[in-house]
Amino acid sequence: MVSHRAARRKRASATELYKTCKQSGTCPPDVINKVEGTTLADKLLQWTSLGIFLGGLGIGTGSGTGGRTGYIPLGGKPNTVVDVSPARPPVVIEPVGPTEPSIVQLVEDSSVITSGTPVPTFTGTSGFEITSSSTTTPAVLDITPSSGSVQVSSTSFTNPAFADPTIIEVPQTGEVSGNVFVSTPTSGTHGYEEIPMQVFATHGTGTEPISSTPIPGVSRVAGPRLYSRAHQQVRVSNFDFVTHPSSFVTFDNPAFEPVDTTLTYEPADIAPDPDFLDIVRLHRPALTSRRGTVRFSRVGKKATMFTRRGTQIGAQVHYYHDISGIAPADSIELQPLVAPEQSDPMDTLYDIYAPDTDNTTVLDTAFHNATFTSRSHISVPSLASTASTTYANTTIPIGTAWNTPVNTGPDVVLPATSPQLPLTPSTPIDTTYAITIYGTNYYLLPLLFFLLKKRKRLPYFFADGIVAL
């Protein structure tokens, strides 16, 4: 919107005011004193002129022109120059009588009168004679080239007075070839300079600034300050404010109205909505979230007052419309995606530092449920659940001395199963066995050394060598 400045009217002069207000008696005192010459300066000149002659000097309250005769130098009178107007030749005046014609002819009359072109006469009765002719030879153009070859030659002349000394071969006037780029060789050695090029960003830690003056900190774009004390807050409940905001300011119904730009209006006396009175500008919309709602906002500029210079004075109003509310997020219980592993009593650990309990029943159960594999070791269920919570229990595995699983720290041993492939014997199996004893020595299973049901009495040796049972 282009604001038009109001034309400033010139104030009337003191002389014009004196002519109009003197008759009505409403003239200000300064106007009367200035026109009538009764100001303090005029009175001082009148009083001082009684004893001092100031005539001809032009001392007064008027313009400094030196009086009617101007300034006269002290040395004498100024030289006067008399302007003589150039003499003009007299104009001959011819008297015109009442009988003279009023039409002035530009060309003099001549005594020769032409009769013009003679009219043709026809003597016969048959009219004009028409003569016709016919030709049987076809109009064929002979485009066969004549016998003989065409030779193209070119001649060039070298003039040293008009030739550049750096050019060896003068360019020809024309060439008969398909190449449109014609070059001219020059004489001399063309010098060049090798400039070493440096590769940037090959050394460094990668934290060097990209620009010469990096901006410290993180720069954020400031949002619109719509809720300051300088903005008047007005809530618009009608949804047409989002799609047709001009319907609240003017009565016009435009065919196309952009809703995402700044809208400008002419100041109107009456607005369809009293909240939009004196609105001359609606800024582009902004979507914000305020107290759990999605809010559509526009800032309007009012033109309530206009100065003589054309400046608009008005408040800034924040118009907003709450579109919808933001519901709180629902808490969803997450389920594990991996099925829990089944605990196997054969893959547990045994706590040797647990308090003394009836281990006989536990060892018997583990012995009968044990499955001997190729690793030749067995694990028993842990008794840590029955231990007191005041002790820090340490768990170690129990197995054979030659194949002991290593478990460091509070690691959890998960069950591990190996696939069992079906074995097909090549020959029929004979179920009858022959037991052959090769000697008197035998070995018990290593597991039986640890799974004794009764306590074994250990001999005590004294210092004198006697064994006590």
UniProtKB/Swiss-Prot annotation:
One of its GO terms (biological process) is microtubule-dependent intracellular transport of viral material towards nucleus. Disulfide bonds join 21-27. One of its GO terms (molecular function) is DNA binding. Keywords: Capsid protein, Cytoplasmic inwards viral transport, Disulfide bond, DNA-binding, Host endosome, Host Golgi apparatus, Host nucleus, Host-virus interaction, Late protein, Microtubular inwards viral transport, Phosphoprotein, Viral penetration into host nucleus, Virion, Virus entry into host cell. Signal peptide: none annotated. The keyword Transmembrane helix does not apply. It holds the Pfam family Late_protein_L2. A motif (Nuclear localization signal) lies at residues 1-12, 450-458. Highly phosphorylated. The keyword Phosphoprotein applies. It is found in: Virion; Host nucleus; Host early endosome; Host Golgi apparatus. GO terms for cellular component: host cell; host cell endosome; host cell Golgi apparatus; host cell nucleus; viral capsid. Belongs to the papillomaviridae L2 protein family. Interacts with major capsid protein L1. Interacts with E2; this interaction inhibits E2 transcriptional activity but not the DNA replication function E2. Interacts with host GADD45GIP1. Interacts with host HSPA8; this interaction is required for L2 nuclear translocation. Interacts with host importins KPNB2 and KPNB3. Forms a complex with importin alpha2-beta1 heterodimers via interaction with the importin alpha2 adapter. Interacts with host DYNLT1; this interaction is essential for virus intracellular transport during entry. Minor protein of the capsid that localizes along the inner surface of the virion, within the central cavities beneath the L1 pentamers. Plays a role in capsid stabilization through interaction with the major capsid protein L1. Once the virion enters the host cell, L2 escorts the genomic DNA into the nucleus by promoting escape from the endosomal compartments and traffic through the host Golgi network. This is Minor capsid protein L2. It comes from Human papillomavirus type ME180. The lineage of its organism: Viruses, Monodnaviria, Shotokuvirae, Cossaviricota, Papovaviricetes. The gene is L2.
